[in-house]
Amino acid sequence: LYHSLGVMAFERGRTSEAREHFRQGVRTEAGRNSAAIWQSWAILEGQAGDEEQARKLFQKGLMVAPKSKYIWLAWGTWEAKLGYVDRAKELLAKGCKLNPLDPYLLQALARLEAEQGDLEAARKYFDQGTVLDPTHQANWNAWAMAEWRAGEIDRARNLFQRGVWVNPKHINAANLFHAWGVLESREGNISLARQLFKCAVNVNKSSERIWLTWAMMEENQGDDIRAIEIRNMCSQR
């Protein structure tokens, strides 16, 4: 109860109220033994700018649930956002060691390595993640994007394609089709990009971002009428 109340207050921007709910929650036996409430409280303090308190709360959560993949992931990604890259890598690596079958921790570590320019290390972790869960389309997408940013266009194409074929009709495939379409449009392969954007909206018609990206490409090609048609389809979806 206290956890739910705290989360609702936090989502409404009532930080002090949320903090008090979390504080009351951990005074109960159930709350003290709940990794989720410690994690939520840690995230609150982190967003409030109290780094020391956030770290203490993450640590208390791990004392309750040492293998909690959610805490290792949340703590590691938070440290990365603050710029404490080495600390983030250490936390994510520990989380991976304790949860060797979790692709999300591997993906987070892979993305961090890619952002730091160590593409070989990133590839190792991305590959491990796809072996663990070949159906995890977000991992294929993240890997493809990392290769694209590094200028490895053919590798990126291959990864987008592999990710799509995991399940072309799953809503997550729309992100792969969309990103792949943007890549092809920037490479000048407009016909292919159109087909990919069409596939993306067929999978996820509610995504305004995909429709507008497609319309913008048509505008850039000088086809204003087609761009208007696509925007109209977006508004009628």
Language-model segment annotations:
Residues 1-237:
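Alpha-helical solenoid scaffolds in eukaryotic macromolecular assemblies
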